[in-house]
């Protein structure tokens, strides 16, 4: 068999990877987890369980919903519909086809259902099975996720954002003293289920406990306890301890001495030992808990108390007459003076009372006695009356309602998470499968609430990440599915009851439209299903990792207070403290930290390295916020020696509550994996983040997401080392699926022969079709370009093509430019930016934007609209770009007003005059009237047509253009098929050749003789088809040839079949919206060069608008003649405190000067002045150990590497672990520059030096998506507002600029009366005046008269609504 590695080039593709000089000191033990796996795991693994066999599916997601809804039975229990299994068919169209045809990328869900029909004997009631029918039922199309974690809905890419919500369970809190005027803390508890009714328990100002269900009217908490079946005695016994007072003749009562119940106070009577009679402390002396413990230790068991001490205590059991056993007082009653006399008279020796003291208050006893309900029935009826006011309360209805509220699995679900949280908070041990409330839960919630009131325990922190969980895509859609299936269940039951069950089949019962509409509604309209932010790859990744507290079941902006929005200590390593929007959503929309992941319960986990006996191991453990509270966790930058031991006497550690403590090394449990785990992906791309103010860092991370992909990409010289990970995980770059060898490359596709062999030993072929000039959601350009050459050997997951904003597999959002910090004639006032003409001339910041325009030809009442070139009253000049069908050519340069697609619409006929009638009678029928309804280029748009798509309805004849596009597409499919076949044929026939050479022929084509031994030359004379006709002696060889032939034929057939399917799909016509016959989409690409008014920004929150483009000769320049590209204002720094940008500039300055140094060394090497050793020495000095892999290679590869860094050396300075000021100085020294990073600069206009040294360096700048071209517009005439008759505002309404109150003051100040008058009248809302003005302008006159503005009339009308009549009375003078 032929070796597949026979022509592998020595140099694998991984040698192309960019090497960065890394300033980080902390070794990474864990890689950054895939950045979009949150989305994919949640939907594909947990919800759909896509590629899992039916028998192996876990009971979660779709499986669990179907299991919980089915079986469905009809009311008489005759028919029973059960769920067997589900599976997905392959989607009809792939991702690309769906986006082009405006369809949803979805797969049909097929559910196998079994309908069992029973025969019921009416006399005995026994059931016998009558028949079973099993059938696969179509339940609608379920959207699938693309490989990048997005959904395609109606042709647009959308993302479902994960939601943060309060975890189900029980929460205890107080009102912080805000409700009652005295400032008393009122405690409350709330049970939040995953779905079902909320239960609240609360104290009022009088310390009585109430409960409410779903925030309805409140009832006494003891009513709830009675409703769950507790009697008065059980309630009192459960919540209180009791103590017995024994009568001691003539002395008082002896009672057990319990030191725990003693608080520090002065005694009102003597403390007497009841057993010995000794007085231990006199009245008026102070007793403390410490003293009490001492006496107890010395043997004090019982103390003597005065007779009247019992007054005010509460009975812990019924008080009975010893003689007659008659009940004298009920349990819980207070002992009064009268009752004490009765006790004395009847000589009752023992009285049991409740232990009520400052540590346990009488709240439940007081509530019991305030509550009128004395038994379970009354309590249930009371609850029924509150929840169903106006309905007659009977015990059955009340019991059923109460059961359904909290104890019925169909209506109440705590979820597994809720049960775990409930168990841990109430210290219970109930099985996790019990997801409804239990009697123990309710009893213990009241217990914990009372304990809180008594000062035991602490309230819950709602913003703690142990109490907030994340609902990802899978779970959100699961909830929608449940809603849809519950609705469907009702319709199934109706259909079962309505029809003849014997003849009905499962598909007759199921109406899938209900389910489909619910899912569709979620994806199209839900607040959490959002149009993907596709400005650049970083914005895509950030959008998928976003956590929103808003949305259904979440918070609303207006109600969210400061606490919810604030950073919480548990956010550490889970949620980024930096990246969040400015404005009303601040803190409600967050981003997940780089290393964070979500566990199966929906809590966010962060990774830590385990520390054993003060030794840091490489074991990485993920902890949630709750688990983390149990440990002491050190920082990632704790000093560690060579053996991995923590150095130093004390280590600074985080403990529960976000506090820091100093502990000895052996006490540390974990340390952070890396300092970068604190921040999000966007923030981790900012070098020197640690030197920036947090507000500016927030702006920096937000503005990186608005950077427009440029034509020429350029990775930052000063990066953080995360750039590669972002580019790879975003899906912008193309990754190799398997190891292989590049067979073909052009700008549109890459063909790779894989090295992973199939069972038959033949290679498979991977064809990567690259995206060329596609429009993103935000009209930026998606374009991929190959990085590989023919013959390259690629490994799985190598980057083989760059996408938008990526450079050699690293994210590249902007460009490196030479920046000087210096004021320049006021042109950089208020953060304005001054740029050199070179930037524009060399297209440094030029970007391509693509706009899509669509025209639909519909079938109207008067006849069909037609796409045509024959348009009435249009000059030939206007049609110059259209083909014979009336559609614009690709490559045409268009500007505003040009026709893109010619279209005519039938016009309703006007009444015919007698003359016309006569002419028609003579000259025959004239064609019906049509009006021009062509698609024109809107104002403000110009560019080149890059793509045209034509879609025709099924059954409508295709026009020439559609056929041409189709033909082009078929040729592309054929080329893919032929190339794949060619690679397989090459392999198969070279293998055949190896088998046949040296064999003896028994039979074969005419050219060969029987008995001959086969040689290579002989085979060269045969055609490929004749190889199969040869028969040889060796039976084993013949068997092998047979197998190869079979595999080859199968492969060929599969390829032909795939090709035929694609062609058939292409030719079959399209599913267009109702009434549409043809749809034409035209894409126009516009090149946006940088111009004044465009917004630019750095990565440190330093943003500004371009004020002027200066000729190169006028810009400041360096002593060697290099012209500065951009001049920034130094005043933008001190107040904003983003010093990171200065350090970046200095390191960038070192970068280009080091590159110059390397280039000089290479030049000298080529001139034979120095050897390769000097270059190696310099590279080691610069890069350290990173460079060893390069230095081991041949000399020419080292020189090739040096050429790659000739523009600038790339640095990585990781967040919080990067270069310090000294490192930057060292690099400047190594580059031969002044350590201050400042240089002498010459003014381009005068040719003189500036007075002071200027900070100059390479800085990474971004062009943001706020382009002046999209903002500026002008209005000539346009629409007016209906009521005020003033022009509308805004570009989209073609509106005017508002001349407001302050602007009027300005004209008043200058006394410009006539200008002011025309502003307020004819240019605004004087309707008659503006019509007359328009007339006079048309006639070429310049006079106008202004009348009364409409807003004055509106004001008069408003006065009239207040019954005030304003009249203008002219009095004669």
Curated annotation (Swiss-Prot):
The EC number(s) this enzyme carries: 2.7.7.6
UniProt keyword list: DNA-directed RNA polymerase, Nucleotidyltransferase, Transcription, Transferase
Keyword Nucleotidyltransferase among UniProt keywords: yes
Reactions listed under catalytic activity: RNA(n) + a ribonucleoside 5'-triphosphate = RNA(n+1) + diphosphate
First-level EC class: transferase
Record InterPro entries: DNA-dir_RNA_pol_bsu_ext_1_sf, DNA-dir_RNA_pol_bsu_external_1, DNA-dir_RNA_pol_su2, DNA-dir_RNAP_su2_dom, DNA-dir_RNAP_su2_hyb_sf, RNA_pol_bsu_bac, RNA_pol_bsu_CS, RNA_pol_bsu_protrusion
GO terms of molecular function: DNA binding; DNA-directed RNA polymerase activity; ribonucleoside binding
Disulfide bond entries: none
CDD domains referenced in this protein's UniProt entry, alphabetically: RNA_pol_B_RPB2
GO annotation terms (biological process): DNA-templated transcription
Any one cellular-component term (Gene Ontology): DNA-directed RNA polymerase complex
Assembly: The RNAP catalytic core consists of 2 alpha, 1 beta, 1 beta' and 1 omega subunit. When a sigma factor is associated with the core the holoenzyme is formed, which can initiate transcription.
Function: DNA-dependent RNA polymerase catalyzes the transcription of DNA into RNA using the four ribonucleoside triphosphates as substrates.
Database matches in HAMAP family: RNApol_bact_RpoB (MF_01321)
Membership in a protein family: Belongs to the RNA polymerase beta chain family.
Protein's recorded name: DNA-directed RNA polymerase subunit beta
GN (gene name): rpoB
């Amino acid at each position: 068999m032929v070796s597949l590695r026979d022509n592998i080039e020595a140099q694998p593709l991984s040698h192309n990877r960019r090497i960065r000089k890394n300033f980080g000191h902390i070794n990474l033990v864990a890689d950054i987890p895939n950045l979009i796996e949150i989305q994919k795991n949640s939907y594909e693994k947990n919800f759909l369980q896509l590629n899992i066999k039916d028998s192996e599916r876990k009971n979660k997601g779709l499986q669990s919903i179907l299991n919980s809804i089915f079986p469905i039975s009809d009311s008489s229990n005759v028919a029973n519909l059960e769920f067997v299994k589900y599976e997905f068919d392959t989607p009809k169209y792939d991702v690309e086809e769906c986006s082009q045809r405006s369809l949803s990328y979805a797969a049909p869900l097929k559910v196998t259902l079994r309908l069992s029909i029973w025969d019921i004997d009416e006399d005995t009631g026994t059931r016998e099975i009558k028949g079973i029918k099993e059938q696969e039922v179509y339940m609608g199309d379920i959207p699938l996720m693309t490989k990048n974690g997005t959904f395609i809905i109606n042709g647009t890419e959308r993302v479902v954002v994960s939601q943060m919500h309060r975890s189900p369970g029980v929460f205890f809190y107080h009102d912080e003293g805000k409700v009652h005027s005295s400032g008393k803390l009122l405690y409350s508890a709330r049970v939040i289920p995953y779905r079902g009714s909320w239960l609240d328990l609360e104290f009022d100002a009088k310390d009585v406990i109430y409960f409410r269900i779903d925030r309805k009217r409140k009832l006494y908490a003891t009513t709830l306890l009675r409703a769950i079946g507790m009697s008065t005695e059980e309630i009192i016994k459960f919540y209180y301890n009791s103590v017995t007072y024994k009568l001691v003749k003539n002395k008082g009562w002896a009672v057990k001495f319990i030191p725990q119940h003693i608080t520090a106070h002065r005694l009102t009577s003597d403390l007497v030992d009841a057993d010995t009679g000794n007085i231990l402390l006199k009245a008026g002396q102070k007793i403390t808990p410490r003293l009490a413990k001492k006496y107890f230790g010395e043997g004090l068991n019982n103390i003597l108390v005065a007779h009247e001490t019992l007054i005010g205590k509460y009975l812990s059991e019924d008080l009975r007459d010893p003689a007659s056993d008659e009940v004298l007082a009920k349990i819980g009653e207070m002992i009064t003076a009268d009752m004490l006399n009765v006790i004395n008279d009847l000589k009752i020796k023992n009285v049991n009372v409740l232990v009520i003291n400052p540590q346990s208050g009488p709240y439940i006893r007081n509530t019991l006695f305030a509550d009128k309900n004395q038994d379970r029935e009354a309590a249930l009826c009371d609850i029924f009356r509150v929840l169903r006011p106006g309905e007659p309360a009977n015990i059955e209805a009340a019991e059923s309602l109460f059961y359904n509220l909290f104890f019925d699995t169909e209506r109440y679900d705590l979820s597994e998470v809720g049960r775990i949280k409930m168990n841990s908070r109430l210290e219970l041990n109930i099985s996790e499968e019990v997801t409804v409330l239990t009697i123990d839960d309710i009893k213990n919630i009241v217990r914990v609430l009372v304990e809180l009131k008594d000062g035991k325990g602490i309230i819950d922190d709602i913003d703690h990440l142990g109490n907030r969980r994340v609902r990802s895509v899978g779970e959100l859609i699961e909830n929608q599915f449940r809603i849809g299936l519950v609705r469907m269940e009702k319709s199934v039951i109706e259909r079962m009851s309505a029809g003849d069950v014997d003849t009905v089949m499962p598909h007759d019962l199921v109406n899938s439209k209900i389910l489909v509409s619910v899912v569709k509604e979620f994806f199209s309209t839900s607040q959490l299903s959002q149009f993907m932010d596709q400005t650049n790859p970083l914005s895509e990744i950030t959008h998928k990792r976003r956590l929103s507290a808003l949305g259904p079941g979440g918070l609303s902006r207006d109600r969210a207070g400061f606490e919810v929005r604030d950073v919480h200590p548990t956010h550490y390593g889970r949620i980024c403290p930096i990246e969040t929007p400015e404005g009303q959503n601040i803190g409600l929309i967050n981003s997940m930290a780089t290393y964070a992941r979500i566990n199966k319960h929906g809590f966010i986990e962060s990774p830590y390295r385990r520390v054993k006996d003060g030794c840091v191991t490489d074991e990485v453990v993920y902890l949630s916020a709750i688990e983390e509270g149990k440990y002491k966790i050190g920082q990632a930058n704790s000093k560690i020696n060579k053996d991995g031991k923590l150095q130093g006497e004390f280590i600074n550690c985080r403990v529960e509550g976000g506090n820091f403590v100093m502990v000895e090394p052996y006490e540390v449990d974990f340390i952070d994996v890396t300092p970068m785990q604190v921040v999000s992906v966007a923030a981790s791309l900012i070098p020197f983040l640690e030197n920036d103010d947090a507000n500016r860092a927030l702006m920096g991370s937000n503005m990186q997401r608005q950077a427009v992909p440029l034509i020429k990409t350029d990775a930052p010289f000063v990066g953080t080392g995360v750039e590669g990970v972002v580019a790879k995980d975003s899906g912008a770059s193309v990754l190799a699926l398997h190891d292989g060898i590049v067979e073909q490359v052009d700008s549109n596709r890459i063909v790779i022969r894989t090295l992973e062999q199939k069972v038959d030993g033949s290679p498979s072929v991977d064809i990567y079709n690259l995206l060329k000039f596609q429009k993103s959601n935000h009209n930026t350009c998606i374009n991929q370009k190959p990085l590989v050459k023919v013959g390259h050997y690629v490994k799985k997951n190598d980057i083989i093509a760059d996408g938008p904003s990526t450079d050699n597999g690293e994210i590249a959002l902007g460009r490196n430019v030479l920046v000087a910090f210096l004021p320049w004639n006021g042109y950089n006032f208020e953060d304005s930016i001054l740029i050199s003409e070179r930037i524009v001339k060399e297209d440094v910041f030029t970007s391509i934007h693509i706009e899509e325009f669509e025209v639909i030809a519909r079938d109207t009442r008067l006849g069909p609209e037609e796409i045509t070139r024959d348009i009435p009253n249009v000059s030939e000049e206007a049609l110059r770009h259209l083909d014979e069908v009336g559609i614009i050519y690709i490559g045409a340069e268009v500007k505003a007003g040009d026709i893109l697609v010619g279209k005519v619409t039938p016009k309703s006929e006007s009444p015919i005059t007698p003359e016309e009638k006569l002419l028609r009678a003579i000259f025959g029928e004239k064609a019906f009237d049509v009006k021009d309804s062509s698609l024109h280029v809107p104002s403000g748009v110009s560019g080149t047509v890059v793509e045209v798509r034509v879609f025709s309805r099924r059954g409508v004849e295709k026009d020439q253009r559609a056929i041409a596009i189709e033909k082009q597409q078929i040729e592309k499919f054929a080329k893919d098929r032929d190339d794949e076949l060619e690679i397989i044929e090459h392999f198969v026939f070279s293998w055949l050749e190896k088998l046949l050479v040296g064999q003896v022929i028994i039979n074969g084509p005419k050219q060969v003789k029987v008995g001959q031994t086969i040689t290579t030359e002989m085979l060269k004379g045969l055609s490929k088809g004749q190889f199969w006709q040869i028969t040889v002696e060796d039976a084993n060889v013949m068997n092998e040839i047979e197998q190869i032939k079979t595999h080859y034929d199968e492969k060929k057939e599969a390829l032909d079949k795939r090709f035929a399917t694609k062609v058939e799909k292409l030719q079959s016509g399209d599913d267009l919206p109702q009434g549409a016959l043809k749809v034409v989409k035209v894409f126009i690409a516009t090149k946006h060069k940088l111009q004044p008014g465009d917004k630019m920004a750095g990565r440190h929150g330093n943003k500004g608008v371009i004020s002027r483009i200066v000729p190169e000769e006028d810009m400041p320049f360096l002593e060697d003649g290099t012209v500065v590209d951009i001049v920034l204002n130094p005043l933008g720094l001190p107040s904003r405190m983003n010093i990171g940008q200065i350090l970046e500039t200095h390191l960038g300055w070192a970068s280009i000067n080091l590159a110059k140094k390397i280039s000089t060394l290479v030049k000298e090497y080529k001139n034979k002045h120095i050897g390769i050793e000097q270059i190696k020495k310099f590279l080691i000095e610069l890069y350290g150990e990173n460079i060893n892999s390069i230095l081991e290679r041949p000399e020419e590869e080292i020189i090739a590497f040096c050429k790659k860094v000739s523009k600038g050396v790339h640095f990585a300075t990781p967040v919080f672990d990067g270069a310090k000021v000294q490192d930057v100085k060292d690099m400047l020294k190594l580059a031969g520059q002044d350590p201050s990073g400042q240089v002498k600069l010459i003014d381009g206009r005068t040719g003189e030096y500036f007075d002071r040294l200027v900070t100059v360096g390479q800085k990474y700048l971004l062009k943001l998506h706020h382009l002046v071209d999209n903002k500026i517009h002008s209005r000539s005439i346009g629409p007016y507002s209906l009521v005020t008759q003033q022009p509308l505002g805004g570009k989209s309404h073609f509106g005017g600029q508002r001349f407001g109150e302050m602007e009027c003051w300005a004209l008043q100040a200058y006394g410009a009366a006539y200008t002011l008058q025309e502003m307020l009248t004819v240019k605004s809302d004087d309707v008659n005046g503006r019509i007359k003005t328009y007339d006079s302008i048309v006639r070429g006159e310049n006079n106008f008269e202004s009348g009364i503005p409409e807003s004055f009339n509106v004001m008069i009308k408003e006065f009239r609504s207040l019954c005030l009549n304003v009249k203008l009375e002219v009095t004669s003078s």
